[in-house]
Amino acid sequence: MVFLCLHRCISSTKICQILIFSIYSRRIYLIQIDTKNMNEDLDDVVILSAVRTPIGSLRGSLSVLKAHQLGAVAIRGAVTKLNGSISVDDINEVIMGQVLSANEGQNPARQAARSGGLPYSVPATTINMVSGSGLKAVILGAQAIRTGDANVIVVGGQECMSQAPHCLSLRHGKNLGDISLVD
């Protein structure tokens, strides 16, 4: 589960700071770019903060948590790593990818945003594009920033496969006998 705060690096500030978390080395890097010698039309989308939760196993210690609860932990962590350089009030939107949202309630991205400490004023969207859901959220966030619709967006993916429900086909009831659960 990777969460990113995306932000437009505007050349008028002359200095753009980027906070990057390396998943592999588990270290945080603050990169500062001097933009005064760069193209004045600089409108690159940069990653301000990135966080992931541990990868759990089926029915492991994280299995009791719903996906939006894991998402909330990561959102809070990504915002905390910004060390106040961007306020939660500066966040324009949350876009989260999630494949299995059954039994999660309505709009799991919104639940993660609220539980992650973001204000009610920040809208949230849940994307389902199967395995590409988290990456699609990143793409949509970057597009919104590049088109000028937003300046700061929290994007990522959340999932807890241990919470995936089993389904019974009971729309028309069931007579006596065995019934199969669908996984």
Regions found by a protein language model. Give the residues of each.
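Acyl-thioester C-C bond-transforming condensing/cleaving domain
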Residues: N39-V45, S57-V88, N103-D183
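Short glycine-rich phosphate-binding loop at a beta-alpha junction
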Residues: D90-G97
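Aromatic (phenylalanine/tyrosine) cluster motif
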Residues: F3, F21-Y24, Y29
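Short polar catalytic/cofactor-binding loops
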Residues: V51-I55
